[in-house]
């Protein structure tokens, strides 16, 4: 994941900062507790494609 891209993209739900999870290949919005997938290295920033983070994931 290109770190320059992380500086300019935002959560499509709340416009908050996204964090890259290398082990799960997801972009994480901590404010909304959502994880957006990467497909072939491309972020899929659609609310319908996001998964809800578990309580454990939200607090890590």
From Swiss-Prot:
InterPro entries, per the entry: Trm112-like (IPR005651)
Stored Pfam families: Trm112p
GO cellular component entries: cytosol
Similarity field: Belongs to the UPF0434 family.
NCBIfam families (alphabetical): PRK11827.1
Protein name: UPF0434 protein KPK_3615
């Amino acid at each position: 994941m290109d770190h320059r891209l992380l500086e300019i993209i935002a959560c499509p739900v709340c416009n908050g900062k996204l964090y890259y999870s290398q082990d799960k290949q997801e972009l994480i919005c901590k404010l909304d507790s959502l994880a957006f997938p990467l497909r072939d290295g491309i972020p899929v920033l659609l609310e319908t494609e996001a998964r809800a983070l578990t309580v454990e994931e939200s607090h890590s």
